[in-house]
Amino acid sequence: MREAPHVLGIVLAGGEGKRLYPLTADRAKPAVPFGGAYRLIDFVLSNLVNARYLRICVLTQYKSHSLDRHISQNWRLSGLAGEYITPVPAQQRLGPRWYTGSADAIYQSLNLIYDEDPDYIVVFGADHVYRMDPEQMVRLHIDSGAGATVAGIRVPRSEATAFGCIDSDESGRIRKFVEKPLDPPGTPDDPETTFVSMGNYIFTTKVLIDAIRADADDDHSDHDMGGDIIPRLVDDGMAAVYDFSDNEVPGATDRDRGYWRDVGTLDAFYDAHMDLVSVHPVFNLYNKRWPIRGESENLAPAKFVNGGSAQESVVGAGSIISAASVRNSVLSSNVVVDDGAIVEGSVIMPGARVGRGAVVRHAILDKNVVVGPGEMVGVDLERDRERFAISAGGVVAVGKGVWI
């Protein structure tokens, strides 16, 4: 049996998330609550920890307070064993400036790599919803001899124009990496599907350091991992693709195997929540063999009183549904739905309250939103448009702490 390689995890968590506004008005995108009990960053951290990659640096930047607090409170590992998950804010090692891109974030954090001296570096994004065993991708990277490996998910060619697309040969070597092409390349075994980059990369350490340092000296670079570093390594013949459909996650069902969602817009964020609520969900939160770890707050169980009910819904701990109806919705912790209220097809974040006789439909309510008695959200879009953000798909989004 070969010795396990020394792997360092780097999570890119500096995303501002403008397209998720107002959910990102007061927090970084990876800190946005998701699924009733989690934040977006919990998915990548769970995947790394489940694979026993237990030395992880989370590079943060914009509005990172709630993200830093979440990591420190809910992701404490054993320091005695040399294990850690640590948030690393912009260090300004090169002067008083923020990170100029994801590659620059790593460049300004090279000291972390030198201190750890890993064999390989796992560089993953922080704002996607999925399960993955990264150890399988690391094994393929080592066996292939590539300097960089990019996780690719298969999508129909007609849907690939909005993503970074991978053109690879039959051996998995990447011939070209193209951002949002008008004519996406097919995969070697299926011309009607395209490998789309998931924003997850494995690097041999020296290859990453050399590429990052060369990129830092390039005045014409945007200093982006997907836009600059990967194309540079593709041109050097050093990059390979990992087919995400080959990833076997313990406990996965046929229905949710290969599930991955970019939730960078309000509509995508909403749709990913609707994937959770059916009897046989598209994405199963209840896989005990590959758990998603989230908030560790000690809360009372959810309670349904006075005939209150929830159908095809996820309801978080501490919530109370009193003589109200909840359908096809995801409610986070400590949500109260009062007598006679109706919540349908909605996402309700922690601490929100829906008052007596109120109606909430096709909406996202951020933390601590209060919908007053008899008020309506998502019923009259023209009226809502004057008060709230509305997505292209007609989802009403109400920002944190708003009273209606």
From Swiss-Prot:
Give UniProt keywords alphabetically: ATP-binding, Carbohydrate metabolism, Glycogen biosynthesis, Glycogen metabolism, Nucleotide-binding, Nucleotidyltransferase, Transferase
Q: Give the catalysed reaction(s), semicolon-separated.
A: alpha-D-glucose 1-phosphate + ATP + H(+) = ADP-alpha-D-glucose + diphosphate
Q: Which domain of life is it from?
A: Bacteria
Q: Does the keyword Cell cycle apply?
A: no
Query: Which GO annotations describe the biological process of this protein?
Result: capsule polysaccharide biosynthetic process; glycogen biosynthetic process
Q: What is its EC number?
A: 2.7.7.27
- Please list the residues that bind alpha-D-glucose 1-phosphate: 99, 164, 179-180, 197
Molecular functions (GO terms): ATP binding; glucose-1-phosphate adenylyltransferase activity
Is Nucleotidyltransferase there in the keyword field? yes
One of the Pfam families matching this protein, by short name: Hexapep_GlmU
Pathway participation: Capsule biogenesis; capsule polysaccharide biosynthesis; Glycan biosynthesis; glycogen biosynthesis
Q: Which CDD domains match?
A: ADP_Glucose_PP, LbH_G1P_AT_C
Broadest EC class? transferase
Which PANTHER family does the record match to this protein? GLUCOSE-1-PHOSPHATE ADENYLYLTRANSFERASE, GLUCOSE-1-PHOSPHATE ADENYLYLTRANSFERASE-RELATED
Protein's job: Involved in the biosynthesis of ADP-glucose, a building block, required in the biosynthesis of maltose-1-phosphate (M1P) and in the elongation reactions to produce linear alpha-1,4-glucans. Catalyzes the reaction between ATP and alpha-D-glucose 1-phosphate (G1P) to produce pyrophosphate and ADP-Glc.
What does the sequence similarity comment in the record state about its family?
Belongs to the bacterial/plant glucose-1-phosphate adenylyltransferase family.
> NCBIfam families given for it?
glgC, PRK00725.1, PRK00844.1
What is the protein's name according to its record?
Glucose-1-phosphate adenylyltransferase
Q: What is the lineage of its organism?
A: Bacteria, Bacillati, Actinomycetota, Actinomycetes, Mycobacteriales
